[in-house]
Amino acid sequence: MLRLLVLLICLPLSAAVAAQQPLRIQQLQRCGDLLGEGPQRWCLRVQGLEQGKPAVWLGDQPLSETHVVRQGDTLTLTLDPPRQRSAPLWLEARGQRSNPVWLTRQRSHVLAAGPDEVAKNMDGLTTYLNLVSVLIEEHHDGLRQAQRIADKYGAQVVGAIAPLNVYQLRLPVHDLVQRDAMILRIGSETSVDAVIVEESAPERGEEGAVQVAKPPIDQAQEWAANRFMDALYYYQRRIPASKVPVKPLRIGVIERAVDFDAPAFMAYRGACGAGETCVYARDGDQAQSHGTQVTGILAGRGGEGAPGGFLTGLGKAAPGFEVIVERNADAGITANIAASVNLVEDGVRVLNWSWGIHRVGARDVRGDEVDSLVRSGLAMSGYEELLEEFFLWLRKAHPDVVVVNSAGNGASWSGRDEYRLPSSFITDQLLVVGGHQRSDQAVALESPTHVTKRRSSNVDMRVDISAAACIRPAPQGRVHCGTSYATPLVTATVAAMLSINPQLTPDQVRMLLRRSALTLGPQQDFEAMDAEDLTAPILPSERNGQLQHPDLGRSARLDMLRALDLAVQSRERVR
């Protein structure tokens, strides 16, 4: 009797707690048969649901209740392929609107391993045990070959990145010895180009932990080194005055989630109007998370002393930017590429990749071994083939897309393809960003000594440009540092440039960024790189052919104002 009484008391209390929780979409994933051509099933995990079904909106259309099934805090949606297309999805209930998330109708989806499907390898890294991906040679029918291989080895095809001819298999193995033996056999198939094994490792570098600067940084000064506010003022005033017909743009951010309870994102609810800056993302529960900070630099709302994001700050002059935060699944690099393929097929023009990995055994500029975000040689060889296939596909099918990637925080070299991915790839469509910080010298902003190379930033000729690496999201907040936070400054600049002149190619974007760049560091002699060279040195061709220009040989520092000015000029100049 006492237990029944306690239960009756607790039920209304739990309902009251649920009612107090804000409505949030915490997870959205394709479920069921990922390869089927029929109706798609999507599973949502939602916080703050009360009794009954919420209204589900896909774009500007509500879904019929017959397409929505609820089980506890999970909603399952069934979508007919011909009737719906990729669009933001959000919920509405009891006067509340949830955060909007992006629901893609594209075909690239992979599975993450469960806790019982991973093991420790000889390098001490967590590796997937029974889930691998195969890259099929391009002249073969990928799905047919993957199914043939699966049938031959008793495996099952469970996921795919179809445009790249990549298919995920679940292997009938129980330990790493069996897995590695089967990988060797599958890799020897004539139709298989590579086998991709997923691994993960803890982040022990700068971005894996909150850093406290001594003395604390001044956020305005850090971004002033890249002329952040000057660029905002220029776009707000010059663009309307010169009647430049700016175009809306979609930006993809490869991150897990954004905390919509953080002040910078509390205003993003429900539908987003035309001409506004929109953020579509799953809800996280950490305001200091990597995804929240990276997205905040792009599109966070400012206030109460906290800096706002660049795209949001453009105000009414902006044509409308859609920032889509997406990672497909927690399946490592393979999921990052699957999400990137879907985003590009959904019309994203700029991709922000604030991630990268080192091979086990990579050494920094001081000769010490890099211990953060490392992967085994087996995993790196598969990732290299996967990334190469992605950039080949991008060049062939979407040559106008720009990928902006962080150089990394191992104090190592970005361009050594045997030790660092993806920044080592040489392609016009990949911009690599290093990190700098304000120096302690009282010099003019234009001086090369106004900033100094961030000690942990990766370096060398493959780094195209550098930007401020440290952020302080709130006046009393902790400081975060790393090239991950320099990268969205460049992404935002590139997005604004393309909104001004959508005809710019990736190679032209790189050229304008470097021609407009401020400098940092000493002049170099164009010999082999040493630890002082943050980026590729400024060349005479990037300074109107002036052989005695003082910028020559120095590293490039992002100048957001001048980059936008050159983008405006490029509309009238034919090269």
Task: Label each PLM-derived region with a short phrase.
Residues 47-49, 57, 64-71, 90, ...:
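Inhibitory N-terminal propeptides of secreted protease zymogens
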Residues 80-86, 176:
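Surface-exposed, short loops/turns at beta-strand junctions within beta-sandwich domains
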Residues 5, 348-353, 429-430, 501-575:
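C-terminal subdomain of the subtilisin-like protease fold in secreted/lumenal serine endopeptidases
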